[in-house]
Amino acid sequence: MSDMITAAILGLVEGLTEFLPVSSTGHLIITGELLGFTGPKATTFEVAIQLGAILAVVVLYWDRFWGLLRPQPYVRFAGLRGIMLLLLTSLPASVLGLAAHSTIKAHLFTPSTVAIALAVGAIFMLLVERRTERPRYMTLDEMSPALALGIGCFQCLALWPGFSRSAATIMGGMLLGARRGLAAEYSFIAAVPIMFAATGYDLLKSWTLFTPADLPFFATGFVVSFLSAWAAVKLFIALVGRMTFRPFAWYRLAIAPLVYYFMAY
């Protein structure tokens, strides 16, 4: 299989799974093993193509991000208040991630821990879906500092590879009283600063693995990741108000043994 096809397949998997509550890590592990693309360079490539997925969310929510740079009298999720909410959400996982980065890389990327994270995240989703309380927060402009910080605390669960940042923040938001659609939308927006920081940090640490000859390979993965993430987020937001997350949970339980197998053997 050519390098460009490998890059395109991995970019497609990254884009489709990064913002869905299914764990992009688990899917990239399986896909990388099937394609025979593993090792330090593969890990760096997976980090790089995340930037394509991040850019897709920036494009989709450009008005919201632009609104953070200028106060708007009738929009509360804007200006300094909007920035403060995103900072509150990013803070817990940023602090914990920086403090425990080496430990996470060394001890939480084992076959058993990633597979268990997939299963635990699935059970968490099923439990949250059993709740029947009416949501208290309906739109981004109703977001409170307490809700933003609470979602940020749940985001720390995503430091466990395989748990899924989207699952942690969407389910955490719903548990704290956010409407299903709001929890998903805020999860995508709040992903940008922390994912950009984490991706940039990882790339800075591994930039020596890049060579000029790798540029077409990385560019292909980046572009495919951007396009597939754009489509996945658009479709997910269109459907999220009419569906539960139970199918995603059962799917995670089904692939957890596969992730363990491909990582262990």
From Swiss-Prot:
GO terms for MF: undecaprenyl-diphosphatase activity
GO biological processes: cell wall organization; peptidoglycan biosynthetic process; regulation of cell shape; response to antibiotic
Membrane topology annotation: Multi-pass membrane protein
Keywords: Antibiotic resistance, Cell inner membrane, Cell membrane, Cell shape, Cell wall biogenesis/degradation, Hydrolase, Membrane, Peptidoglycan synthesis, Transmembrane, Transmembrane helix
GO cellular component terms listed in the entry, alphabetical order: plasma membrane
Reaction catalysis annotation: di-trans,octa-cis-undecaprenyl diphosphate + H2O = di-trans,octa-cis-undecaprenyl phosphate + phosphate + H(+)
InterPro entries linked to this entry: UppP
Signal peptide interval: none
Location of the protein in the cell: Cell inner membrane
Coiled-coil annotated residue ranges, if any: none
Keyword Glycoprotein: no
Keyword Membrane: yes
Function (record text): Catalyzes the dephosphorylation of undecaprenyl diphosphate (UPP). Confers resistance to bacitracin.
Family statement: Belongs to the UppP family.
Official protein name in the record: Undecaprenyl-diphosphatase
Organism: Nitratidesulfovibrio vulgaris (strain ATCC 29579 / DSM 644 / CCUG 34227 / NCIMB 8303 / VKM B-1760 / Hildenborough)
Gene expressing this chain: uppP
